[in-house]
């Protein structure tokens, strides 16, 4: 993660953010945050308001953020959703409701709130059920002909041109996210995860002290597992795409 970008993004989203809040948001010590603020002042990403003493994001800071601007989002919605049987016999899993709201629509609205409107939904099973979203939210649909036999890597393969050279969210249609976690700017590739106690057949992650994923394996116990949204930076996608082509 680019720490200068995270500092600039924090002031872009909340000009009144405090150093203590920054430390909490970035999971850093106050001392590290203080040093980063000093670096951002030297680079002219921030300036100090002479009247209030507050830090202000500068034009140079906004210019620095542009490299991290999110270009769009891809939502995978092609699968049958066997875990939701019998609900998915007639309704795709992403169109199931939680608290009276369809899961995929909630994510689309959260993306819109973050200023992200270039959204493509990868469809397969009962693909016609998603067509109403085109008019309602101006999304695009892309058909994955291998949805019944292959996994999400095949989905990324069919959508690879949407990721090539772009900063993109990769979401799954059947996630319900309480708080909006999307941003106009993302300062590095990431994959969200949850901790699972006991045995699991999910994709289990190993990471170093800096939170960088070092390995992935199918199945494990008492482990962090791949679960939920991901963000693929253009640099990450440019390395990933040749591996799946």
Regions found by a protein language model. Give the residues of each.
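Key DNA-contact positions within bacterial/archaeal DNA-binding proteins
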Residues: 31
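Conserved beta-loop-beta/alpha segment of the NTase-like Rossmann-fold superfamily
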Residues: 128-204
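Conserved core of the sugar-phosphate nucleotidyltransferase
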Residues: 177-245
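A short, conserved structural fragment
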Residues: 41-51
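Short amphipathic alpha-helical interface segments
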Residues: 1-25
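N-terminal glycine-rich phosphate-binding loop and ensuing alpha1 helix
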Residues: 9-12, 60-127
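Short, cationic-aromatic polyanion-contact patches
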Residues: 1-3, 18, 51-68
């Amino acid at each position: 993660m680019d720490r200068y970008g995270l500092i600039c993004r924090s002031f872009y989203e909340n000009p009144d953010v405090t150093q203590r809040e920054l430390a909490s948001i970035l999971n850093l010590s106050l001392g590290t945050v203080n040093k980063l603020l000093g670096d951002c002042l030297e680079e002219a990403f921030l300036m100090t308001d002479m009247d209030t003493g507050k830090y202000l994001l500068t034009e140079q800071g906004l210019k620095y953020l542009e490299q991290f601007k999110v270009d769009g989002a891809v939502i995978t919605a092609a699968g049958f959703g066997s875990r939701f049987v019998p609900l998915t016999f007639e309704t795709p899993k992403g169109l199931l409701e939680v608290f009276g709201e369809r899961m995929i629509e909630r994510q689309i609205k959260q993306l819109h709130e973050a200023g992200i409107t270039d959204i493509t939904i990868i469809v397969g099973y009962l693909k016609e059920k998603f067509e109403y979203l085109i008019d309602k939210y101006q999304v695009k649909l892309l058909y994955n002909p291998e949805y019944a036999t292959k996994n999400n890597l095949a989905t990324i393969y069919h959508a690879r041109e949407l990721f090539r050279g772009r900063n993109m969210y990769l979401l799954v249609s059947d996630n319900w996210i309480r708080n909006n976690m999307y941003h106009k700017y993302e300062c590095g590739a990431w994959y969200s995860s949850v901790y699972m106690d006991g045995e699991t057949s999910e994709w289990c992650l190993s990471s170093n002290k800096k939170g960088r994923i070092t390995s992935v394996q199918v199945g494990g116990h008492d482990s962090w597992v791949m679960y939920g949204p991901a963000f693929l930076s253009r640099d990450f996608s440019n390395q990933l795409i040749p591996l799946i082509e």
